[in-house]
Amino acid sequence: MERYESLFARLKERKEGAFVPFVTLGDPGIEQSLKIIDALIEAGADALELGIPFSDPLADGPTIQNATLRAFAAGVTPAQCFEMLALIRQKHPTIPIGLLMYANLVFNKGIDEFYAQCEKAGVDSVLVADVPVEESAPFRQAALRHNVAPIFICPPNADDDLLRQIASYGRGYTYLLSRAGVTGAENRAALPLNHLVTKLKEYNAAPPLQGFGISAPDQVKAAIDAGAAGAISGSAIVKIIEQHINEPEKMLAALKAFVQPMKAATRS
């Protein structure tokens, strides 16, 4: 959890926002997936948001569903994902690592056991995409017991009560949703919602990172100009993996070429 605090403090000092890429662990296979993560970090990623392949991803658009299918085709299991997480943590001791999950994967393990496993692997945060704030108590309590930040999604239509709950329960960062719907770079993010950012600050919420539909540097800049602490990009990155699926070296070069200008856009 503390890794997020250190990161945001460091970035604030440098007058920068955070650029956070999302990929699915094990896509397109374990070895290449680890190389992808190294390439993202080398190109300037400030933190990582990682998915564990799951058979029924509700909030994911087709791009990320395909990533899940590729990981399944490579035979990747949740247990192997945790081995990967431990390797990533060993190699990159300071970068914040977040998981984007679905509740079934947490239930399969047992809630407490799942968060204990996260702590052991060096995971900093977990966002359970299909658990609404009002049902989150067992998840967030287990998370805090194991020094894992519970992350909450702040939707564009959040009312005051929800904003207060998110501010009160969330740690690490707040996932600020650009718009409702499924993920995807085709659906470009609408401009960030300044009033939400203002309210979240007022209620002392964890720093907001804007996600969903972030696929170009100007959107990263717009998110930060509106007061977000940074931006998360997933589908646009996963699409690059898909486009270069048979050219592993080209894939890594293309990922770096995408991340560098996205990170550059976080510098005021």
From Swiss-Prot:
Pfam families: Trp_syntA (PF00290)
Cellular-component GO terms for this entry: cytosol
Keyword flag Lyase: yes
PROSITE patterns in alphabetical order: TRP_SYNTHASE_ALPHA
Matching CDD domains: Tryptophan_synthase_alpha
Keywords assigned: Amino-acid biosynthesis, Aromatic amino acid biosynthesis, Lyase, Tryptophan biosynthesis
Record: active site: 49 (proton acceptor), 60 (proton acceptor)
This protein's pathway: Amino-acid biosynthesis; L-tryptophan biosynthesis; L-tryptophan from chorismate: step 5/5
GO molecular function per UniProt: tryptophan synthase activity
Enzyme Commission identifier(s): 4.2.1.20
Domain of life from the UniProt record: Bacteria
Catalytic activity: (1S,2R)-1-C-(indol-3-yl)glycerol 3-phosphate + L-serine = D-glyceraldehyde 3-phosphate + L-tryptophan + H2O
Alphabetized Gene3D superfamilies for the sequence: Aldolase class I
Disulphide linkage map: none
Function in brief: The alpha subunit is responsible for the aldol cleavage of indoleglycerol phosphate to indole and glyceraldehyde 3-phosphate.
Subunit structure: Tetramer of two alpha and two beta chains.
PANTHER family, per the entry: TRYPTOPHAN SYNTHASE ALPHA CHAIN, CHLOROPLASTIC, TRYPTOPHAN SYNTHASE, ALPHA CHAIN
Similarity comment: Belongs to the TrpA family.
Protein name: Tryptophan synthase alpha chain
Source organism of this protein record: Escherichia coli (strain SMS-3-5 / SECEC)
Name of the encoding gene: trpA
